[in-house]
Amino acid sequence: MFDSPWRMWRRHWDIRHQPRLFLETLGVLFLAMALPYAIINHLMNAVGWSAFDPVTRIDEQIPFIGWSFIVYLSLYLYYPAAAWFGRKNDVIVREMFAFHQTLFILTWMILIIFIVLPTEIHIRDHIPLEVRSGEGFWGYWYGDFMHKTDNPWNAWPSLHVVQSLLIVLILRRWQVISGYKAVSYTHLTLPTIA
């Protein structure tokens, strides 16, 4: 299971020199990670039981900053980055498959934790009511888009931190980012803790 690419990659291997490898890899990412996450997120929201509250005093002291949504969205640029830069040559394509297998397994393990120990985020109350109601520019992004798409569940452990850190590490391995850029990208994972 861990020492060679899974069978599902055979089709991808056959098209490894074609541009569509990128899009097909994104499709696998959606089916293997995004879709299960969304289903579990909405299921836990419907159940409505939280095992514990992961919020700390520090979390409660951080004020709402509307533009931080842009930082949050930057996480979603990481996912296609590994699929995009993992097409350079046959060795890197194999590494990309192994990387995504690792990412899938870790994600699935965390999704099991989300089911067994669901955690609700209670800090949304810090967001002004008009923003939560969908009013204004930030209201659209928070109230209408994010909060209806991603319910305040699945807070612990943080998939954002695990996934973004792994992606940065594989990009470093492939020397997509190095030196000061590597430090910058690694620091970009810090805001995903929020």
What are these regions (language model features)?
Residues Y76-R94:
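Internal transmembrane alpha-helix with an interfacial aromatic "cap," most often the third helix
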Residues I40-D53, D90-A182:
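Membrane-interface loops
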Residues M1-A81:
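N-terminal transmembrane-helix/juxtamembrane module of multi-pass inner/ER membrane proteins
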Residues F85, R172-R173, L188:
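Hydrophobic alpha-helical transmembrane segments
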Residues T186-T192:
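Conserved small/polar residues in nucleotide/adenosyl-binding loops
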